[in-house]
């Protein structure tokens, strides 16, 4: 077992995220709904109040949701119309095409949701992926995922890669517009340590293609074939899969080698 896995410890219960159904009866985690809301705010709904956002959620994402819940989620995200900031302290940087030639130049980060059928609730998996060597550098599993969790996990990822001065190495973090990544605490941390944080435009998941591909593999290899009874069971399964993904599974994009073997080979020259 790697050091990454030895350091994991089951953290017990945390606040439970809820969900809403869509018109097909599929359960949509509140975290995903929050992402939908933030994408709307970044686009056509910038000047809308919560009731128009509620209407868009029903029309665009086919959610069965009531206005009170949309109000509550908007209030939690600090984006009710009176709460919205006119001037952003950390201006948004739009993701652009880059030529990546080495590890630790560009990391992608995103959140994936998993369902625990035995407890009828969702858990969160936040992961940082190196675009060059494709390793999952570090990750967070929890029943909740905040901007502070994203910061803590990023700090651990920097330590794992022995990056003491991100500004000197020119590290770029690329994310979508999820609430964790537009939070003040995340933007402030990136600014303080010298990381350039860029965000993909709304409805362009191809700009975060590598971590989206990882999420599809995770879904196919693990989540879609598992029915978790407890959070502890889901937690253990994800930790085991992450070890497998980095250290055992071969990848066609890197000469059919395991990711960690490829990364260590690059380090050795």
What are these regions (language model features)?
Residues 191-195, 216-269:
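C-terminal domain-tail junction helix/linker
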Residues 2-106, 204, 260-264:
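Basic, flexible linker segments flanking DNA-binding modules
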Residues 165-182, 205, 257-260:
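Acidic/histidine-rich, metal-coordinating catalytic segments
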Residues 105-137, 145:
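An active-site-proximal beta-strand-loop segment
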Residues 121, 139-164:
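Active-site beta-loop-alpha junctions of metal-dependent nucleic acid enzymes
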Residues 86, 172-175, 191-210, 227-231:
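RNase H-like polynucleotidyl transferase catalytic core
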Residues 105, 135, 147, 151-158, ...:
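Retroviral integrase
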Residues 62, 99-101, 118, 204-207, ...:
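Conserved, non-catalytic sequence blocks in retroelement Pol enzymes and Pol-derived host proteins
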């Amino acid at each position: 077992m790697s050091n990454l896995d030895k350091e994991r410890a089951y953290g017990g219960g945390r606040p439970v995220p809820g969900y809403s159904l869509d018109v097909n009866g599929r359960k949509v985690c509140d975290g995903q709904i929050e992402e939908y809301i933030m994408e709307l705010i970044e686009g056509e709904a910038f000047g809308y109040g919560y009731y128009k956002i509620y209407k868009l959620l029903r029309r665009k994402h086919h959610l069965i949701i009531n206005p009170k819940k949309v109000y509550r989620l908007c209030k939690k995200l600090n984006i009710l119309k009176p709460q919205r900031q006119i001037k952003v302290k950390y201006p948004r940087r739009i993701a652009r095409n880059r030529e990546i030639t080495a590890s630790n130049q560009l990391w992608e980060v995103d959140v994936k949701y998993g369902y625990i059928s035995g407890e009828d609730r969702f858990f969160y998996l936040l992961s940082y992926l190196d675009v060059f060597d494709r390793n999952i550098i570090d990750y967070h599993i929890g029943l909740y995922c905040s901007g502070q969790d994203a910061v803590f996990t990023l700090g651990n990822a920097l330590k794992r890669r022995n990056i003491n001065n991100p500004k000197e190495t020119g590290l770029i973090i690329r994310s979508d517009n999820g609430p964790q990544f537009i939070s003040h605490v995340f933007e402030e941390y990136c600014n303080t340590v010298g990381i350039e944080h860029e965000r993909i435009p709304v409805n362009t998941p191809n700009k975060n293609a590598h971590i989206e591909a990882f999420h599809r593999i995770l879904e196919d290899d693990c989540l879609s074939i598992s029915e978790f009874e407890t959070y502890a069971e889901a937690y253990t399964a994800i930790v085991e899969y992450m070890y497998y993904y980095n250290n055992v599974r071969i990848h066609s994009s890197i000469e059919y080698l395991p990711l960690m073997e490829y990364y260590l080979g690059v380090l050795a020259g």
